[in-house]
Amino acid sequence: MNCPFCSHNDSKVIDSRPTDEGQAIRRRRECISCSKRFTTYEKIDEIPLIVVKKNGNREPYNRNKILNGVIRSCEKRPVSMKDIENLVDGIEKQIHNTMEREITTELIGNLVIDKIKDLDGVAYVRFASVYREFKDINTFMDEVKKILSEKPSL
């Protein structure tokens, strides 16, 4: 590590501790040449996640796209923002657990469908109608009937 004061390339570590909830390491160093102290941070270099769209295009993963879709589906429903954040956190955890560098919009959509179904039935139907591209009222009604047969309390 080059010293920011004299540019000497040798230093010794005085102190080392985890920061950012264990996502980084903060190191206090002392230059061997000029004896000045400085701080460095060590972080894992995360591999960017790429989303493969239905048309084959690729784009960087964007949490806000999932979040906005779920928020729209839960509009005017008794669902708190905390519940929505937790739902999206759970989806992200599942995505990262796949250990894949590329993930399809189909997989993301299915994860949202599975999670939102347990959160709110109306939000589920709203999301499913857009995600599954319901063509007519019969498709919509079939999905509602399926939900009602699974959860008669709706």
From Swiss-Prot:
Pfam families, per database record: ATP-cone, Zn_ribbon_NrdR
A Gene Ontology BP annotation from the UniProt entry: negative regulation of DNA-templated transcription
Requisite cofactors: Zn(2+)
Alphabetically ordered keywords of this record: ATP-binding, DNA-binding, Metal-binding, Nucleotide-binding, Repressor, Transcription, Transcription regulation, Zinc, Zinc-finger
Zinc fingers (unnamed) by residue: 3-34
Name of the encoding gene: nrdR
GO MF term set: ATP binding; DNA binding; zinc ion binding
Cited HAMAP family: NrdR (MF_00440)
Family: Belongs to the NrdR family.
Note describing how the cofactor binds: Binds 1 zinc ion.
Residues of the ATP-cone domain: 49-139
Protein name: Transcriptional repressor NrdR
Transmembrane segments: none
